[in-house]
């Protein structure tokens, strides 16, 4: 079945806007006339609503509305004979893939990633583990890890421990203690999130543990510095790389394959529809405003921290120069006849340095004001 085309998304947007959404969402009462105009039975309409309302808030945002409209048109046009039991991967918005994953986990009762393993089972497994841990990540494994990373990273490229819980549930040979140990290994600073490099190594450790290798007690020196960064990196200009789909080796199940199938990123599934491809529409404006708000928050935080640090440093330096100038002036009063020329030269030099410092401070204040004005214009 084809993905949603850009022209189709724009058509749905016109209908969506015509229903006058509030806070970019449509209530059931506003969507009901459109659904009933399809002349589909009530039970099918109820099922379509259930599939479309992914976050179960009783309203449909634009992405959810697109899902409902496509399901209706497919049945009315004969492309589908009935409402599917679950949303196909190509129709799941990337922004809501994690909700689909969570809903399926709850529906199947798999909401514990330790798989009901006992401590005795874990101890027996530990005795059978080998110590020949291999830090090398093959291209195939890296592609799989990147697919998992792309499915769970936030807008800053960071990944939370809880966001991978669906993956943990598929690891039948990895106890929760080993998962926690692997996380702590790549996250020595105990941040709430980890970056891409840390995530890939974390997944590699889980993969090795799933295949009978003991979780190591440390990481190579080449990785230690990377994992010990003092602050997370929020590089918004870095794009998510496009990776090729991994292939399974031999006949055994590839690491993360069942998990990727759940979130619609498996090699057997089509890629989900990109609802962001709506240039020139109000929906694009809404989406860009959200991104702008996030950028403004980050910029304001950075500006405040930078301004406070610069002001403090300049204030201390200025005070030191003023004290030095005062000391030299007192020396001049006490010993007016000794080295008078040298003292005057020192005073003039210090006064010049103070003036330069004040000018530098004024320039930085002007730059800060200009930055505040640019932020105000973007709002």
Swiss-Prot record:
Alphabetized InterPro entries for the sequence: EF-hand-dom_pair, EF_Hand_1_Ca_BS, EF_hand_dom, EH_dom, End3
Biased composition (Polar residues): 235-251, 264-276
Domain EF-hand: residue ranges: 40-75
Family designation: Belongs to the END3 family.
Annotated segments matching region Disordered: 235-276
Keywords: Actin-binding, Calcium, Cell membrane, Coiled coil, Cytoplasm, Cytoskeleton, Endocytosis, Endosome, Membrane, Metal-binding, Repeat
SMART domains listed in its UniProt record: EFh, EH
Protein name stated in the entry: Actin cytoskeleton-regulatory complex protein END3
GO CC annotation terms, alphabetical: actin cortical patch; actin cytoskeleton-regulatory complex; endosome membrane; plasma membrane
Example of a GO MF term: protein-macromolecule adaptor activity
């Amino acid at each position: 079945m084809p993905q949603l085309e850009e022209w189709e998304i724009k058509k749905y947007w016109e209908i969506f806007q015509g229903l006058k959404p509030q806070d970019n969402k449509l209530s059931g009462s506003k969507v009901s006339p459109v659904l009933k105009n399809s002349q589909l039975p009530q039970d099918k309409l109820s099922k379509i609503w259930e599939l479309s309302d992914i976050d179960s808030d009783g309203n449909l945002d634009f992405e959810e509305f697109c899902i409902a409209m496509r399901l209706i048109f497919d049945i009315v046009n004969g492309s589908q004979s009935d409402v599917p039991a679950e949303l196909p991967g190509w129709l799941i918005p990337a922004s809501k893939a994690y909700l689909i994953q969570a809903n399926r986990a709850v529906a199947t009762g798999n909401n514990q990633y330790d798989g009901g393993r006992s401590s005795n089972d874990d101890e027996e497994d530990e005795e059978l583990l080998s110590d020949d841990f291999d830090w090398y990540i093959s291209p195939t494994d890296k592609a799989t890890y990147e697919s998992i990373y792309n499915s769970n990273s936030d807008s800053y490229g960071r990944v939370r421990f809880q966001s991978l819980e669906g993956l943990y549930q598929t690891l039948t040979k990895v106890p929760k203690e080993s998962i926690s140990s692997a996380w702590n290994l790549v996250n020595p600073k105990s941040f709430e999130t980890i970056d891409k490099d840390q995530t890939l190594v974390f997944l590699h450790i889980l993969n090795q543990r799933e295949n009978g290798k003991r979780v190591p007690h440390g990481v190579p020196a080449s990785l230690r510095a990377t994992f010990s960064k003092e602050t997370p990196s929020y590089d918004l200009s870095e794009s998510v790389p496009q990776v090729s789909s991994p292939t399974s080796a031999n006949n055994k199940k590839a690491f993360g394959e069942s998990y990727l199938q759940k979130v619609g990123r498996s090699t057997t599934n089509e890629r989900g529809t990109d609802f962001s491809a709506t240039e020139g529409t109000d929906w694009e404006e809404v989406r860009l405003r959200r991104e702008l708000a996030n950028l403004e928050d980050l910029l304001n935080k950075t500006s405040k921290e930078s301004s406070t640090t610069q002001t403090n440093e300049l204030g201390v330096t200025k005070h030191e120069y003023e004290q030095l100038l005062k000391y030299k002036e007192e020396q001049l009063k006490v010993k007016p006849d000794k080295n008078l020329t040298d003292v005057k030269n020192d005073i003039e030099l210090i006064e010049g340095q103070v003036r330069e410092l004040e000018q530098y401070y004024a320039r930085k204040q002007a730059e800060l004001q200009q930055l505040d004005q640019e932020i105000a214009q973007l709002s």
